[in-house]
Amino acid sequence: TASDYYATSEYMNNLPIKDFGIIDENLRKRIVSSFVNNENKPYNKNLIEKTENFINIPFEELEEKSNKNLNLLRQKLASETIQNLRNHYDQNLFYLEAPTGAGKTNISIAFATELLKFDKSLSKIFYVFPFTTLVDQTFQSIKDSIDINDDELIQLHSKAGFPSNKTQEGEYGSNYKNYIDYLFVNYPITLLTHIRFFDILKGNSKEANYLL
């Protein structure tokens, strides 16, 4: 179905689609490098390069309540997560549970960059959330953490639909290429809600089935 849509689009609109939003080697290196070398978040570089140091900090030294110890606890949690990935990178399922404020969003971004380093077969990243507010928050966190362009990151939920109206001919004018990318999720990193995720897996609408 998808290939037929692409072929029809190219024939009717003279619009061949050649970029499917795949994470190639250049983008992979840019994501990893920008996360580690982000001047606004120097703790990411420490996390990746000094993982063992944070893991070896005894919990007894972090019992006193202070911002410093809170940040060290976050780094310790993140370091243990990264270390587990490095030891079991051939696994397909990981589970992270931590209280609010523990830095799970930053850990997830660090985890994704490490996965990209270990597994060259990974070509896309999907974040699935229960609430649209979490999509919005994580979208901004990703933009603040890595060097990613607007056409490489997308939000898919009911409050972030394709921002254009169809013309009388049923096309999107100069935005038609953007519409195709949105329809087929031609983006390296996609953030979506549970509703959209399960709609893709179990829905029977034409547009939902394009992604299967």
Predicted regions and their residues:
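Pre-Walker A (Motif I) flank of P-loop NTPase domains
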Residues: 89-95, 123-124, 186-188
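Inter-Walker segment of RecA-like/P-loop motor cores
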Residues: 148-206
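Post-DEXD/H (motif II) to motif III coupling segment of the RecA-like Helicase ATP-binding lobe
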Residues: 208-212
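N-terminal accessory nucleic-acid engagement/regulatory domains that precede
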Residues: 1-61, 145
